[in-house]
Amino acid sequence: MSPARDEAVVCVHGLWLSGFATGFWRRRFIQAGYAAQSFSYPTVRQSLKTSARQLAEFAAELPQRRIHFAGHSLGAVLIVAMLAERDWHVPGKELGRVVLVGPPFQGTDVGRNLARVALGRVILGRAVQDWLAHPPPVVPLGVELGVIAGSRPVGMGRIAAPNLVPPHDGTVRVAETRVEGAREHLTLPVSHTEMLMSARVTQQMLAFFEHGAFTR
């Protein structure tokens, strides 16, 4: 289906994954008439700042005028890092709406536990350690941003943090997903991994792109 509107959605994957991981999102967005694209980046060996610059350059090259962003986990905080660094001043482009899914915005207990040991730091990679080393950036004024958290406590994160305080999605606590300045915050009964394959999640993302609000 060809896009029915002059709008694109850039989908950004999380740690240890590639653009293939956001394929379900991308297909749903294309079906809804958006020109959806998946952005891939090396999540372990590359710095957060470098990936943020590459994300901005990727979005600026798209032919559509209005650009929305959808990010999962590390991909979600990468989007915020890009916006905070560059404030999205791209000639001929308009920043659309932003949906962060399972973002460890306030840091992550799982990540902090892993970062205490050398092997854990290798597993986390540079970008996550960059994020944990500094306070969360301020979301620029005017950005229409929605957050989706999960409350199904199933995931590998519970191995690194067996005493993870509920509610959480098996990797990220709901409290860690709070973003100051967000327009909307919604918790759904999905795990951290399920977010990438959930029709309910994509329906809510599309509602936010279209109306600037989740459906309740």
Predicted regions and their residues:
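Serine-dependent carboxylesterase/thioesterase catalytic core
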Residues: 4, 9-15, 19-20, 24, ...
